[in-house]
Amino acid sequence: MKNSVNLFMQGIFCIGVLCLSSCQGKKANTNMTKALAETSVKSEFYGFNSQVEWGEHLVLIGGCHDCHTPKKMTSHGPVLDTTLWLSGHPANMPRIDIDRKEVEAKGLAVAMDLTEWVGPWGISFSANLTPDPTGLGNWTEEQFIYALRNGIAKGIPGSRPILPPMPWEMIRYMTDDEMKAVFAYLKSINPVDNIVPAPVPPTSVVN
């Protein structure tokens, strides 16, 4: 009888150990699966947690804010106006007061916030890149990629060329995945209602 009880208790103990091991194994497998999934996502987006985060990184290192974000002037120089993030040349900003003919013949002139440029091509204004309808709100991903690959405004075949200083000739070498990430980020930021002025032809054409 005593041996039977001992055998029974040993059996219960073994079952308990097996159940515990099984639970721990399942938990370990779940954790491993989760870790592998997170690693896979980060690998897909080059170490970032999402396509949007990767796109934000590309926008920052690409210097897009240099021209597309208006600035506030301070005693330390211009600083980015975070309320107008990537919204382009402000519609209500006065034009640069210069002798355009002389500037276009000799070089270029730039507004203090770097959103207006005057040169041999005429006057160009930094575009609104926010998801507002006055910016990229109605753009498709395909249009965005076409614009950057071909230097064509609004990504519509037959439209005017993208004007300087937009460095699309270099940006065109980004991969499709990089461009898609940038577009995803731009679609995620705060929309800003800002109708950027249309470019102005050079004086040589006007006259």
Where do the protein language model's features map onto the residues?
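Bacterial N-terminal signal peptides that target proteins for export
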Residues: 1-12
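Bacterial signal peptide processing site
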Residues: 24-26
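The canonical Cys-X-X-Cys-His
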Residues: 55, 61-71, 144, 182, ...
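C-terminal capping alpha-helices of c-type cytochrome domains
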Residues: 138-153, 168-197
